[in-house]
């Protein structure tokens, strides 16, 4: 699970880097709430939307302490590509002084099912304009 989360975070950083800087890549915005087993996701869960259509730019967001997120292409451009998107989730590990990875306190115990990480089967449609897309993660087997 740790390696998959690292891969997901690595892919996020890669996609952010290749999209570059800009002001607006689309007229679509996406906000919402992520819940895990019915309760709000803790601060720091990464949400990624990858357009199914070739050539689309991925978007990402991080949950706040109430589970809310807002998608952005990079630090200066908010938004998401309209159309069908693959949605995936991840958590970002930090490193201590010795380089040992650990999860920050709010993310300890967070379980993201493998099918919602890399190669996720979850899809959501983004309409032009403002979108409110709430996302539910269930950890039940």
Question: In which residue ranges do the predicted regions lie?
Answer:
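Beta-strand-dominated extracellular/periplasmic modules and repeats
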Residues: 21-141
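Sec-dependent bacterial lipoprotein signal peptides
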Residues: 1-19
């Amino acid at each position: 699970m740790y390696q998959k989360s690292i891969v997901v975070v690595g892919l996020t950083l890669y996609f952010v880097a290749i999209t570059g800087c800009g002001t607006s890549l689309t007229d679509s915005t996406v906000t919402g709430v992520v819940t895990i087993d019915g309760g709000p996701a803790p601060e720091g869960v990464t949400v990624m939307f990858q357009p199914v259509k070739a050539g689309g730019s991925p978007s990402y967001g991080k949950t706040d302490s109430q589970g809310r997120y807002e998608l952005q292409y990079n630090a200066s451009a908010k938004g998401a590509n309209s159309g069908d998107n693959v949605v995936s989730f991840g958590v970002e590990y930090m490193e201590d002084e010795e380089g040992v990875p650990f999860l920050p306190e709010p993310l300890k115990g967070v379980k993201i099912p493998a099918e919602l990480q890399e190669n996720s089967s979850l899809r959501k449609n983004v309409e032009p304009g403002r979108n409110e897309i709430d996302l539910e993660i269930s950890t039940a087997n």
